[in-house]
A protein has these predicted regions:
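Short acidic beta-strand-loop surface patches of small beta-rich interaction domains
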Residues: 41, 158, 191-211
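Hydrophobic alpha-helical positions that pack around
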Residues: 44-170, 182
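Short amphipathic, charge-patterned alpha-helical segments
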Residues: 19-23, 171-186
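Short loop-to-beta-strand transition segments
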Residues: 32, 183-198
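Active-site loop ensemble at the mouth of alpha/beta enzyme cores that anchors a bound cofactor
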Residues: 93-105, 207-224
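Ferredoxin-type iron-sulfur electron-transfer modules in oxidoreductases and energy-metabolism complexes
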Residues: 5-9, 30-32, 36, 40, ...
């Protein structure tokens, strides 16, 4: 659950257009594409209107402000496939092809959209360009940490009182986000798990509530900042049930182009579903971990490489719940009905 990009698209589309024009000037590009899910009707509408306004004011188009630099922006609608979050899958989709990743190298910076060198960035990154140029790097560095300066937009969802979007300094801890900004867990229940970085992010226990959230520290614990999603779960949830939900998602979203991801996501889901039904057997957890490791090193793109991350971190931090399902045929929360 992340919608911070949609907020920027709908709330401040001109920041994206300005950032793209600056980026285009920096790299010598004269055309930019904004790839948006087709379901985001309001985002597309407002972005289209912003492009018209920018062209009318001479901020986009030919010979911008008599500078000799020309830059135009075009919106391309996607069908919502998760794999198109991978840069080469996104490029394939923009070209009108099926959304599947390309073999790399060549990388997009060398041979990308229509065979030309291409820069691919998230809208949050692009929207940060104008204020940094306007205020300077020292202004940006006053937020966050020395290694990870600036701010990050997070989407707070799940079992938390104050759901929504927050912008916080890099390096803030999970504890501060959940209890000071998010207002804590509803109904007086206990915090159990936080998934950072979206569906393919790691799942962290209460022992890691004081870990700084930045691009360096989270990977040390098996997770990442990723898309800025923060899914909070209380102690009423079964870890195995959550794992089954995640693995079902990845099985469905795999494009099927490479064998490790196509077969790996299906097998991960199959094994976790059996454990949830009380049909798990000794060795299943080791098999899950081994299969996940193989996928991480052999899958063609980031989807297959990241799909095992939730299950691997769950096995690391919540292994006792999996063992209860296998050894005792018992779901500690009563969720799985075994």
């Amino acid at each position: 659950g992340t919608f911070k990009d949609r907020l920027i698209l709908e709330g401040d589309p001109h920041s994206i257009l300005e950032g793209m024009a600056i980026a285009g000037y920096a790299v010598g590009a004269d055309k930019g594409f904004i790839y948006v899910r087709g379901e985001y009707v309001l985002s597309i509408e407002r972005l289209g209107k912003a492009i018209e306004q920018a062209k009318a004011l001479g901020l986009l188009g030919s010979n911008i402000f008599g500078s000799g630099f020309s830059f135009d922006v075009e919106i391309r609608k996607g069908a919502g496939a998760y794999v198109c979050g991978e840069e080469t899958g996104l490029i394939e989709s923009i070209e009108g092809k099926r959304g599947e990743p390309r073999i790399k190298p060549p990388y997009p910076g060398t041979e990308g959209l229509y065979g030309k060198p291409t820069v691919v960035n998230n809208v949050e990154t692009i929207a940060n360009i104008p204020p940094i140029l306007l205020n300077g790097p020292d202004w940006f560095r006053q937020f966050g940490t020395e290694r990870c300066p600036g701010t990050k937009v997070f989407t707070l969802t799940g079992d938390i009182n104050n759901k929504g979007l927050i912008e916080v300094p890099m390096g803030i801890t999970l504890r501060r986000v959940i209890y000071e900004i998010g207002g804590g867990i509803p109904g007086g229940r206990e915090f159990k798990m936080a998934q950072t970085g979206g569906t393919s992010g790691g799942c962290l226990p209460k022992e890691l509530l004081d870990v700084p959230m930045d691009y360096f520290t989270l990977p040390e614990h098996g997770s990442a900042l990723g898309s800025g999603a923060l899914l909070i779960m209380d102690d009423s949830h079964c870890i195995v049930d959550i794992a089954e939900c995640f693995m079902r998602f990845f099985e469905h979203e795999s494009c099927g182009k490479c064998t490790p991801c196509r077969e790996g996501t299906a097998r991960l889901h199959e094994i976790v579903a059996k454990i949830a039904r009380g049909e798990g057997k000794p060795g299943d957890l080791e098999l899950l971990d081994e299969l996940g490791s193989v996928m991480q090193v052999s899958s063609l793109c980031g989807l297959g490489q990241a799909a095992p991350v939730p299950i691997k971190t769950m096995l690391k931090y919540f292994r006792d719940e999996f063992e209860a399902h296998i050894n005792d045929r018992l779901c500690p929360t009563g969720t799985c009905g075994i």
